[in-house]
Every structure is written in structure tokens, then in C-alpha cells.
Amino acid sequence: MSTYVYGIARSSHPSLPEKMGGIGDPPQPVRILVQGALAALVSDAPEDLRPKRRDLMAHQNVLAEAGAGGAVLPMRFGGISPDDDAVLAVLDEREEHYLERLRALDDKVEYNVKASHDEEAVLHRVLADNPELRGLSEANRAAGGGTYEQKLALGERVAAAVQQREASDAVLIQEALQAEATDVRPGPESGAWLANISFLVERDRADGFVAAIDKLQQANHHLVLQVNGPLPPYSFVE
């Protein structure tokens, strides 16, 4: 049977969740595979593994339980090896790399921040910051909306200004938060977000990081911030 891998820790980790229920129906018990200075948290892999909510939560719960007692390199959901021996071989081959990453992630968590614009609020912000656009908008309004060509020209200029604002706000968000983090990773780009950034934060500085997010939001009401964390540091495993 194939082996499902949740994460990698030091073999000296004090509280790895052996026999905890993992993925599968019924839940497969978590096992610990030890190779030298490393240990892998694994279980048997179901043949029909899919990203169902129950299994996603089980994966997360195993990592949360292990992470509460020490550094763990989290694997993303769906990591399967042919068997236990294949897992042990990887631990042996990449021992120094994994130990270096464990040292780098000791007592740290990940926060992911996604940002978008409140459409109405950002339009007000763009017009407030651009006297020329504001004048054109007011002139169109005074003329009963303006001609079709005037409306089109104004709309194009406003759209360009909003796009520029997206780029500058992405920079603003990273600069406002990175001082509270030890590392930063950009996430996958999406048309739904103007920024998708993961921050590696020391556990004892998490309150300061959250406070920086609150301060950023209070100063920029046109931003819609979606914050997810604290999380296992998926984006920083490398």
C-alpha cells in the first residue's frame, strides 16, 4: 500500500502524534518513520484519495497537533510515496536540507494575506487623489453625464488609475507587514486578488503582525483584506 506523508520533523521532536486519526474513512492511524535525525509523519494512503473536506481537515489537524510541540515541515495535501522505504530513502538523501529548513522554521508560523479593492471605496480614493480626474468627473456630472465619448474617455482613465492603484497597493501591503515577519513569499497570481502574499512570523510576534494588519486596514478603507493564519509554514518548506 502507498504511504501518505503529512510532514517531516526532527526525530527528537517531543510530541509527534503517533496513532492519531489521519486521512481516510475510517481514519488511518498516523505512524512515525525515523531515519537518522529525521522523522516523517505518515499513514497508509487510501486508494481513492480526493480533497474532501474531512480529509483536508484531518491533514491539517495532524500538522497542527505536531506543530504545537516543535518545528514541522508541512507537506501539502495529497503527498503520496510508493511505500515506507521510499519515504525513508528521501529522508536519508535530503537530511541536511530538511534539518536546515527545520532550523529556519523553528517557532514560526505562516500568515497568508490576500487583498482586493472595495470597488466603490477605491473609486472615491482614486478621484480624491487625482484632481484632474475629479474635475472631469464633476464636469460630466454637471453636463448631465456628458456625451458618450466623454463618458468613455473618463471610464478608461478611471480604470487605468484603479489598475495603477492595484499595483501600488500590492507594494504598500508588503511594505506595511514585512517588518513584522522574518520572510515573505508571493503566492499564485489571480484576477480575484491584487495581492496574495505569505509571511513567515515568529510565534511570539504574531500579535504584532495582526496589529500591523489592523493598522493597515484602518488607514486604507478601500482595501479588503483576507487573512488566513496562523498556519503551518507551507510556503516556506522549499
UniProtKB/Swiss-Prot annotation:
Q: At the top level of its lineage, which domain of life is listed? A: Bacteria
What role does this protein play?
A minor component of the gas vesicle, may be involved in preventing GvpA aggregation during gas vesicle nucleation. Gas vesicles are hollow, gas filled proteinaceous nanostructures found in some microorganisms. It is not clear what function gas vesicles perform in soil bacteria.
User: Which gene is the coding source of this polypeptide chain?
Assistant: gvpF
Taxonomic path: Bacteria, Bacillati, Actinomycetota, Actinomycetes, Kitasatosporales
- Other facts: This strain probably produces some gas vesicles from the probable gvpO-gvpA-gvpF-gvpG-gvpJ-gvpL-gvpS-gvpK operon; it can be induced to produce more under certain growth conditions.
Keyword terms, alphabetized: Gas vesicle
Family membership? Belongs to the gas vesicle GvpF/GvpL family.
Q: Give the GO biological process terms.
A: gas vesicle organization
**Name this protein carries in UniProt:** Gas vesicle protein F
